[in-house]
Regions:
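Glycine-rich, acidic/polar active-site loops that bind/position phosphate-bearing ligands
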Residues: 1-162
Length: 165
């Protein structure tokens, strides 16, 4: 069900969200992009990598970044991740628009990848073995957290983690 109306009564533009969406580009057979000749060398050099031996899918990632910016979605960066064919982008938003922008950024990612004949996999652990999975980290702050902060505020956040994590 749509909880937008209820959320709009609580969430304000003073609430800032930063999402870090990790994903793999995939070949039509489901294997990660760049793994066409089998399993690549161990992960490590791929993180924020450059060079054809270290990245696969950069053009798609950059096209996605540009499309989101043109659509008014505030992507603040993109980078190659720990495994070959794995990428991340960072999406910043305020209030309810943050969630909308995350969903639309994913939609644009899938559509642009389709134009290149590849898929997108956001599964948390798409490859078995000693390969990193993909997450979607969520960062949050409000005015108090960005300005004054306090030990009391920090402690209350830690207490909430016992219920929510």
């Amino acid at each position: 069900s749509n909880t937008r109306d209820a959320a709009s009564k609580v969430v304000t533009d003073e609430w800032w969200f930063g999402f870090e969406q990790e994903y793999f580009f995939t070949n039509p057979d489901g294997s990660p992009l760049g793994w066409e000749d089998g399993e690549p060398r161990p992960q490590g050099d791929y993180y924020c990598g450059v060079g054809a031996d270290n990245v696969s899918g950069r053009e798609i990632s950059e096209m996605h970044l540009q499309a989101c910016i043109e659509a008014g979605i505030n992507l603040t960066g993109t980078n190659a991740e720990v495994a070959l064919g794995q990428w991340e982008y960072q999406c910043f938003g305020k209030g309810i628009k943050a969630g909308d922008d995350l969903w639309m950024s994913r939609y644009l990612l899938y559509k642009i990848a389709e134009e290149y004949g590849v898929g997108v996999n956001i599964h948390p652990k798409p490859k078995k073995g000693d390969w990193n999975g993909s997450g979607m980290h969520a960062n949050f702050s409000n005015e108090e957290m960005r300005t004054a902060g306090s030990e009391k505020l920090f402690s209350s956040i830690c207490d909430l983690s016992l219920i929510h994590i």
